[in-house]
A protein has these predicted regions:
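Small-residue (G/A/S/T)-rich helix-start motifs and N-terminal tracts that mark the onset
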Residues: 3-4, 9, 13, 17-161, ...
Length: 326
């Protein structure tokens, strides 16, 4: 046989075998932590198809946040959830913030109900949502915190996938037991290092351990120069510092929370590795959101340098999404 033809056949066989190994091995990670290569392969599996779908099947995400001081945070979270692929995004915010957010985008569904006397209206909206993000721009007023506790309790009853960020994390640091034993499909917390220390202090005061006190359905992403994901299953934990830059623009965490709301719903719906494993879904969705956000950051920084803002990161969503999922 011609040596060139033989080499070509051998190369084709190796490529085919490599592909088969990828497919068969990506779900075999019972002993060691998930590696980036495996996480990237699993990330591809959560992306839903577009053919033959009706509006809403790619996800309906709710963002609960905003205040008289902060209108950008819930907008960044909501518009990201929409632009990465959720079909519908609802924003529940204060009356003063609602008008501003509506002027930012006609694509978002905005409700001016974030007030204690509207709790019944909020409860009537949550069943529409496939995943709920609580915290962006929420504020820390006592009335607001109590309202958030009531909303979290209602999400528990409805078993809604929950993402807690920013002032939502502050609320938990003041009442750590509010998410204790949260039912499946669970909660993902997304603190930065400062917020993580406050949460750790809250857990310590309750004589609890960092990632076991809340129960097996609560996972944590600690954001820093290197992101770290913690769950109660060691194999699903990971660390990653790919992408990103030294520029920490205000609003970057809100972008991540919105993306995570969408990806969390997708991961839960995809039955990764042929099984409904909540912690695996949380791990892969969080990895995808962290990688995507870091790519938005690095791409925006390459263009804008130190003048980069979260608004510049929004412009890189399409490109970052393609690199994350394709």
């Amino acid at each position: 046989m011609n040596i060139f033809v033989y080499s070509l056949i051998t190369l084709c066989f190796l490529l085919l075998f490599s592909s088969c190994v990828d497919v068969s091995n990506k779900c075999k990670f019972d002993i060691a932590k998930l590696e980036p290569r495996t996480l990237n392969l699993l990330t591809q599996d959560i992306l839903p198809g577009l053919e033959g779908k009706t509006k809403g099947e790619a996800g309906k995400v709710g963002i609960i946040g905003g205040s008289i001081e902060y209108t950008g945070a819930p907008y960044f979270s909501a518009i990201t959830a929409l632009k990465v692929g959720s079909d519908l995004v609802y924003v529940i915010t204060t009356e003063s913030a609602s008008l501003v957010i509506k002027t930012y985008s006609p694509d978002l569904i905005v409700y001016p109900f974030l007030k204690a006397n509207h709790l019944h209206k909020i409860k009537s909206l949550i069943p529409k949502m496939d995943a709920v993000v609580i915290g962006p721009g929420l504020g820390r007023e006592d009335e607001t915190l109590q309202l958030i506790y009531d909303i979290i309790e209602h999400c528990k009853i409805l078993r809604k996938p929950l993402v807690l960020d920013a002032d939502g994390l502050y609320a938990v640091s003041k009442n750590a037991s509010i998410i204790k034993d949260y039912p499946q499909p669970g909660v993902i917390l997304t603190p930065n290092q400062r917020e993580a220390k406050k949460l750790l202090a809250a857990i310590s005061s309750n004589d609890g351990e960092w990632n076991s006190y809340w129960g097996e359905n609560v996972s944590i992403l600690v954001k820093s120069e290197e992101d770290h994901f913690y769950s109660n299953t060691l194999a699903y934990n990971w660390g990653s510092k790919e992408g990103g830059s030294g520029r920490r623009a205000g609003g970057q965490g809100d972008i991540l929370s919105g993306a995570l709301g969408t990806f969390y719903n997708w991961a839960l719906s995809s039955k990764l590795c042929g099984k409904e494993h909540i912690q695996l879904a949380q791990s892969v969705a969080t990895y995808a959101a962290a990688k995507f956000t870091r790519l938005c950051n690095s791409k925006a920084y390459a263009i804008n340098g130190r003048s980069m803002t979260a608004s510049d990161m929004l412009k890189e969503i399409h490109s970052a999404f393609q690199e994350t999922f394709v």
